[in-house]
Amino acid sequence: KDYGVGISEEDLPRVAEEFYMVDKSRARKQGGAGMGLALCSKIVEMHGSMDDQLIREFSEKLEYLRSLDKRREEIRTLIDGQEKLTDEISLALDNAETLSELEDIYRPYRPKRKTRASVAKEKGLEPLAEIILKQESKCDPVAVAEEYVDEEKDIANVEDALQGAMDIIAERVSDNAEIRKRIRNLANVNGVISSVAVDAEKDSVYRQYYDYKEPVKKIADHRLLAVNRGEKEGFLKVSVEMDTERPLNSIAKVMITNPACACADIVKTACEDAYTRLIFPSIEREIRNDLTENACENSMKVFGLNLRQLLMQPPVKGKTVLGLDPGYRTGCKVAVVDGTGKVLDTAVIYPTHSEAKVKESKQKLLQLIKKHNVDIISIGNGTASKETEMFAADAIKEADHPVYYMVVSEAGASVYSASKLAAKELPQLDLTLRSAVSIARRLQDPLAELVKIEPKAIGVGQYQHDMPQKRLGETLDGVVEGCVNSVGADLNTASPALLSRISGLNSTVCNNIVAYREENGAFTSRAELKKVPKLGPKAFEQCAGFLRVPESKNPLDNKGVHPESYKSAKELLALLDYSDKEIKEGKFTDLANRVAAKGTKSLADTLKIGLPTLDDIVKELSKPGRDPRDELPAPMLRSDILDIKDLKPDMVLKGTVRNVIDFGAFIDIGVHHYGYDSQIV
């Protein structure tokens, strides 16, 4: 089996043990983090280049396999404790590939609450059930059943005896792992998700699902989540439907061994009861749970993609930005920040009020633009955003220098403004003005600003509140950490919120880093990190490669080269004939050509490192302090507004993707209405 990263089934236990991918408690004891650099580098050396998302998926697969093995052994022990474990059962457990298959095997041995079958067994009817199941040609079930009539046991007549026997047979059919597997497969292939209105006269957003059917194997995630929500809110009744003929025939092939026997009809009736009363309701729950779980996983991946796109937007560096937090009644909050994000000025204007107020607001905006030499206006995309955009576009036409504007997502700005972190960062500002500061700063550096907000508060998808919140939180946190680690952080300027997303650092250590910085001045090397209280060797190993120190005398401290690779990096530069002066200045011109001339394989062998590590070192030395966000399309700055009436057939426009969903994307082209594109590869 291949689990996606070239790991064979035989390798899994060793890999899981070596990398602590599965045993989280052990990882915690070792001070390990999911994105630990040592972990990543070892996997990369074994399997080639892997991004953090692939590593995370690999980790999740291994965790599932470990939980599968754990449950397998638990069931084996439980059955053995009942002295019913056979070689056949043990082999079936070994061959089971899913938790559902394991539970099917365990079902007959699971302690049961009182059931119709258990009551019949208490009455002594199990021998009758065994006789009927044998289906011997000469067997007369009625005659045999007469022997079990006993009023003291509440078996008043033959019908009672046969019914009890059928209850026992039905439960046995339901407990048959092979039968359940067949029915499950049939339901997955032929089943249909059906939704009907609880009250067809009552209008709701779910009207399209009031009489709706779609095959289990085809239903899209967003439609499944929609009917689930409609059911939860009381508008829909949802079920799985399937024609009964094929499943009943499938059961009969297993249970009816002698169709000509009089007992066969009784077995057939018991099979029908087992399917209708016991098997299908259980399979229906399983299918809906599996579909929902799968839809949630896929949706969370889409949410993660949306969040990643928000976080990895290219920064607008070194520009003075005026942030506008739009509003109607309470006005539009204004904040001006310099190129470093420092607050220069604040105000409140009323661009959606009376004509006099609009004129006054325009004058105030132009005054702020002139006073602080504003380069760009950042407009939040919430309530009154369109009106504010029109106002700003009109106002900047009268500015004394070129000014551009951009609409940014204001999701989570209000959450940030009311947070303890905002109160600590901006104690002098009113809560409402803090959101304007956030809107300005998230244009300058979206990642640095958005990490201050809980990922779920950023708003990354339509059904995010229907997701398992713990799992969603873990997924989004992983995305944030991946983005921060990908970009890196300046050790001397990064906020505690940004530092806390660096692999290996917790909130206590982050606060200690800031405290050390304030007490001792700027860090002069990565090695100085080791002096920070509570930052141990494991944490240093994991975080050092993601932290930059521009002020260091060692040029490698300002690159994405990990300290454990410094020796290899220096040896590489020596092999490539760079002078001490060039190394000190960090100027490695013609590096790629020199590496090619020597041969990457030869260099890797000489340095005794893997090719992926060598490639990473070369990339980092070639592009000092490279920011992966700079390789993406620059933010779309506008100086004038476009109206939908201005659009003509065959026009080609650039736009900003505002939201990605599993059936398309919504794109802002600046005309007040998002375009929709479903043709996304």
Cite the ranges covered by each PLM segment.
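Low-complexity, acidic/Ser/Thr- and charged residue-rich accessory regions of DNA metabolism proteins
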Residues: Y148, V158, A252-M255, V267-C271, ...
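Acidic ATP/Mg2+-coordinating residue in the GHKL
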Residues: D2
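Short conserved segment of the HATPase_c
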Residues: I7-F19
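Glycine-rich ATP-lid/hinge loop adjacent to the conserved G-boxes
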Residues: Y20-Q30
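Long, highly charged, low-complexity intrinsically disordered interaction regions
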Residues: K70, E74-L78, L429-L433, V437-A522, ...
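Short alpha-helical Gxxx[C/S/T] motif in the catalytic ATP-binding
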Residues: G36, C40
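Duplex nucleic acid-engaging cores and interfaces of nucleic-acid transaction enzymes
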Residues: L54-E57, Y64, L68-G323, G327-L429, ...
